[in-house]
């Protein structure tokens, strides 16, 4: 099996001598799209994420790309798969909230699922298809469609139609009857006044063992993670929230991260490698630099889309959430903070003609 390098070995292989303008150069004007990061060592990660990590590790919720006219760009969606394999992640998740899910049509969702199933065929990453819908019947229909594509896992946020945990039970048990594949329960609270109780999750996982995968994001999130980790019914517990608390969540025992982070996938991969090497100093340092960028995204709407375009992952920065024109001051701030991550940035693969 290909050797797994520690974070320190990886950085050494990447030639961690030059820091600063040699990587990113001067801040570009609005609309610039290419970046010249460091070369990627061939042996950064083992060849089979599914076999080695066993549904552990980094599961990236793919962002949804759009053409200049606002149509879903299926070519860029497929290219994102190539980028994420190159970056060293373990799983692909789509479509969820970070994918612009509420703004996608049924036809776009189904065609996007088909696109990703084809693009990921023969690759080492696990494919996780999001099948949540507002009501149980619609969710079951989408889950049956997804099942035919043979993903490695499905994920579902709870329903928006209903009034009690009994409605949640009907929803998730119905999904469990559609597939025998692992199902990730995302604990986003969708029904006002309905608490997604951990005991309820344990009951579901006891009855349907393939429901024992949890993306935990309900408050109090740290207490809930602690209540789930190590329980015999629970197969995996995943961190969320853009990785904002990932370092602490790792200490609590989570099995990975599920979040929208395509623009930082290589950096989170470096953080995961440091964790696997038990190098908590590097975990802290990488996470601290990531937090600066995550804060920058909160301060500057549109920064995430800018970075997807800036790094060459997407061909446009188009969004369906309203167009944002960044000022040069905002671009300068994004670029300044991005330089803090340069030791971990990998080159985005060239697009095939």
What are these regions (language model features)?
Residues 20, 85, 248-353:
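Structured C-terminal cap/extension of enzyme domains
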Residues 77, 109, 113, 139, ...:
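A general structural signal for well-ordered alpha-helical segments in protein cores
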Residues 25-61, 67, 71:
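C-terminal segment of N-terminal export signals and the immediately downstream linker at the start
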Residues 2-4, 9-32:
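N-terminal export signals
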